[in-house]
Amino acid sequence: MANLGSEAEREPLLGPGSPGSREWSEIETQEHYKSRWKSVRILYLTMFLSSVGFSIVIMSIWPYLQKIDQTADASFLGWVIASYSLGQMVASPLFGLWSNYRPRKEPLIVSISISVAANCLYAYVHVPAAHNKYYMLIARGLVGFGAGNVAVVRSYIAGATSLQERTNAMANTSTCQALGFILGPVFQTCFALIGEKGVTWDIIKLQVNMYTAPVLLAAFLGILNIILILFILREHRVDDLGRQCKSVNFQEENTDEPQIPEGSIDQVAVVATNIVFFVVLFIFAVYETILTPLTLDMYAWTQEQAVLYDGILLVAFGVEAVLVFMGVKLLSKKIGERAILLGGFVVVWVGFFILLPWGNQFPKIQWEDLHNSSTPNTTFGEIIIGLWNSSREDHSEQPTGCPIEQTWCLYTPVIHLAQFLTAAVLIGTGYPACSVMSYTLYSKVLGPKPQGIYMGWLTTSGSAARILGPVFISHVYTYLGPRWAFSLVCGIVVLTILLIGAVYKRLVAFSVRYMRIQE
């Protein structure tokens, strides 16, 4: 909080020693402080590797799927990509609940082991004689299931940091996550040098090529992560003021000693924050999904151009997110997390409002049939098909523009490139600010109680948004066009802003709500 000096983080802190309670009698020594932050940094790495595990194969899934199973089509590709989020959605509350009652090492090691095994399965999906595409579906779903440990990571960091440290720690977590999404495709590009044939070990039926090398690297990094967790991670817990506490996971039951009444969690604030986080991830999924189809339709780009330019834009988006994460750490100390959350949604609303088409200039119409249409039929993952095919096709005769099958192309004005880029900057600023502030506030609202299951539900809401967002924008954009699509998104953002305004006073730290400390 504002009245706590930053130097206090490094000083030994003496608990108040409340009668009848041993929990608050601990002192945070310098050794404990170093061990606590060493453990937190191990979980930063875990978050980074989880993101890399998702993004390191995202651009090569389609060609690999075609190679192992000729019956796979674009629709099945959408299921393969969505299976990651489905797996994470199911696993998050389970791992979160587990972490509430047992040492966090257990769900972390089990979840990472599942991811390692799933990545190895992905490398061997070419071996079965039939139904290979379903093995890939299972592999990606299990990788997502292993990524459910995000709930454990966030709950650990929330419990191992004081209120003053929390925003910085959560921002660092988001930074590592964003870096994982950025660097994953970079690793994939490097492995492309190996080629499709690569090297084969017949004895173990292992093919190391441009498709399998990335997942084998992810599996190796996962094993290193398990080793670090086993030997470095320690159970740490501090209260909102930073005083050392005994971890709930190891606290012995003692019915003879009275317990300090902790108060109840504000469930209204909990539900509201889950809704807010759902909208945050929904917005990102919508924007990510619509990016390439929109540029194909509005600017008559070829698929090669769209993949190149939009890929550059997404990398810039990730870099901008990292800068925003670093910026909010400083800004939150001056204006608070709630103001940043509200301001972030306002910026996002302005971004989508700018994307609304105006004027009397219309996009180029594509009169010819285009088999690989720019219509976003399922998810952003289908656009990966264009990335792989673009390097093999002759684009000199490829029809470009807004396909006539989308009737709105005939009467909807074009979105000018300046509009598009301005909106990208604004959305790229607002989204990461809203993301980190939403689960930072969430962790503070929950207070000193174990947060595993609650963080699991938060991660589940985010996974659901990543599944539903592409479905929503695909149908609305295809049949009604960008004006309706972005207008509805603006409406959703306005409703979310009103929700934040309604619960604004409730979005305070647990200790502040019960007046144990002053905000």
Curated annotation (Swiss-Prot):
Glycan attachment points: 372, 377
Region (Disordered): 1-25
Keywords tagged on the record: Chloride, Chloride channel, Endosome, Glycoprotein, Ion channel, Ion transport, Lysosome, Membrane, Transmembrane, Transmembrane helix, Transport
Catalytic activity: chloride(in) = chloride(out); iodide(out) = iodide(in); fluoride(in) = fluoride(out)
Cytoplasmic face of the membrane: 1-41, 97-106, 162-174, 234-267, 332-338, 440-452, 505-519
Chain ranges on the Extracellular side, renumbered to this chain: 63-75, 128-140, 196-212, 289-310, 360-416, 474-483
Membrane topology reported for the UniProt record: Multi-pass membrane protein
Keyword Membrane tagged: yes
GO biological process, one term: inclusion body assembly
Molecular function terms from GO: chloride channel activity; fluoride channel activity; iodide transmembrane transporter activity
InterPro entries assigned to the protein according to its UniProt record, in alphabetical order: MFS, MFS_dom, MFS_Domain-Containing_Protein, MFS_trans_sf
Gene Ontology cellular component terms for the protein in this record: chloride channel complex; endosome membrane; lysosomal membrane; lysosome; membrane; mitochondrion
Motif (Dileucine internalization motif): 13-14
Membrane-spanning ranges: 42-62, 76-96, 107-127, 141-161, 175-195, 213-233, 268-288, 311-331, 339-359, 417-439, 453-473, 484-504
Subcellular location: Endosome membrane; Lysosome membrane
PROSITE patterns for this protein: MFS (PS50850)
Disrupted gene: phenotype observed: Retinal degeneration associated with blindness.
Function, as annotated: Outward-rectifying chloride channel involved in endolysosomal chloride homeostasis, membrane fusion and function. Conducts chloride currents up to hundreds of picoamperes. Regulates lysosomal calcium content by reducing the lysosomal membrane potential, thereby activating TRPML1 channel and further release of lysosomal calcium ions. Regulates the pH in endolysosomal compartments and may contribute to progressive acidification from endosome to lysosome. Permeable to other halides such as iodide and fluoride ions.
Family of this protein: Belongs to the major facilitator superfamily.
PANTHER family in the cross-refs: INNER MEMBRANE TRANSPORT PROTEIN YAJR (PTHR23510), MAJOR FACILITATOR SUPERFAMILY DOMAIN-CONTAINING PROTEIN 8 (PTHR23510:SF3)
Protein name, as recorded: Major facilitator superfamily domain-containing protein 8
